[in-house]
């Protein structure tokens, strides 16, 4: 009986170690069918204008008042992520890893991502 109890306890501990933490989702979440690109790509590849992309990086700066925007950095650059057009906000998450799915928008000199969904992990 003692061996059965120990085996049961080991199985429970193993199940906890394999489940991992789930991501916090905001907006529509991440669309797994949309390609993952680097931040530098949204600046250098003009064909991405108006297209949906997914980015992954760290939240380097964030709106202090309402959480309606942030900058995402991935080692290749930093891009402005705008949450306001889709009507959602993010609680303080500066320094956290994030994935963003959104539309690449650019004007003459600026590039931004209109976020449709964000996951923090």
Question: What label would you give each PLM region?
Answer:
Residues 1-4:
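Positively charged n-region of N-terminal signal peptides that target proteins for export
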Residues 8-17:
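Bacterial N-terminal signal peptides
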Residues 20-121:
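OB-fold and OB-like single-stranded nucleic-acid-recognition modules
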